[in-house]
Design a protein with these regions (language model features):
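Solvent-exposed soluble domains appended to multi-pass membrane proteins
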Residues: 1-315
Length: 315
């Protein structure tokens, strides 16, 4: 497990999604076919699918996911409209059950499976006028903050239970399976950072602590027993703090895989610059202002390679 430093707060989820699935630092228009890790796994013979239980046109995912090389993009219109959970859409447990169905069916047909899913349960905004359940003591918080935080934590509890059940299922699944689980951004809990301020959480972006509190998101790389045996790894311990575009690198480095040429190239970049954010870079383990980088030439080259890889399909 470790942390990713994203570049969004309270919304804009596709930024984190697309950094991960492409490995890109800067995005192309996605109006035509582009290289991605989905396409990479497809080239390795995997069935590659994306899932998100809300409408497919949201954030133009219908078009973009096709450009990224997914065989199918399952969304509200073509799969998940049978569910009526959080906000009228599938809960995490229902989404996970659909992932499992596709995993089992694909493996049964003799194929490997790569799935990129985005959950919806516990998406904000959170009820602020009514308290559903209480998880923290009221230390003279405003009613709005107290209600919002507790209602958010209720959603976290439900999502955690669904994730635990998915882990438990995978641990007993015969085929070697790895799950990378991460958040997109920290939650919007009301006006600005008011609720965070009441909780005593430093969100001052001029400080490293505040910057990390604002943009840091946990990730987990989980493997079932079959995968642990194949890779001779226990999948425990703390990994690096990185940008989301390096998450696939982190997995491949851990299991000893090189990946394609782009992944190998970005792994070299990662050795020097493991966090890339408009405010700070993390260079050789130390945060430095993005305007004062010691590796600006490397960043400039990365942008050029990024552009070339995005616009030249490896067919």
């Amino acid at each position: 497990h470790g942390s990713i430093i994203v570049d969004i707060f309270g919304g804009g989820t596709v930024s984190t999604e697309r950094h991960f699935i492409t490995g890109f630092y800067e995005f192309p228009s996605f109006r035509r076919e582009t290289n991605s890790y989905a396409r990479y796994f497809k080239e390795q013979g995997y069935v590659v699918e994306a899932m998100h239980p809300i409408y497919g046109a949201f954030y133009n995912r219908n078009t973009v996911n096709a450009s990224l090389g997914f065989d199918a993009y399952w969304n509200y219109e073509n799969r998940f409209n049978i569910y009526n959970g959080w906000g009228g859409y599938a809960n995490d447990s229902e989404l996970y059950s659909e992932i499992v169905k596709s995993l089992e069916e694909t493996n049964k047909n003799g194929n490997h499976y790569f799935n990129f899913s985005v959950t919806y349960q516990n998406h904000g905004p959170y009820e602020s006028n009514t308290l559903i359940e209480s998880y923290i003591k009221n230390k003279e918080y405003s009613d709005v903050t107290f209600n919002t935080i507790n209602n958010y934590l209720k959603g976290i509890k439900d999502s955690n239970e669904a994730l635990y059940n998915l882990f438990e299922y995978l641990d007993n699944y015969d085929e070697p399976t790895i799950l990378i689980f991460f958040g997109d951004h920290n939650p919007y809990l009301g006006d600005g950072t008011y609720a965070y301020d009441e909780l005593g959480i430093n969100m001052d972006l001029s400080t490293i602590e505040g910057f990390e509190n604002y943009y840091s998101i946990p990730y987990v790389i989980h493997a079932n027993e079959s995968a642990k045996e194949i890779f001779d790894k226990d999948f425990t311990g703390e990994l690096d703090t990185i940008s989301p575009n390096y998450l696939m690198n982190e997995l491949f480095e851990y299991i000893g895989y090189e990946g394609n040429e782009y992944l190998k190239y970005t792994s070299e970049i990662k050795k020097q610059i493991d966090v890339i954010n408009p405010i700070y870079y993390k260079e050789e383990g130390e945060y430095i202002s993005s305007s004062n980088s010691n590796y600006q030439n490397m960043i400039d080259e990365f942008i050029k390679v990024n552009y070339y890889w995005a616009n030249n399909i490896n067919k």
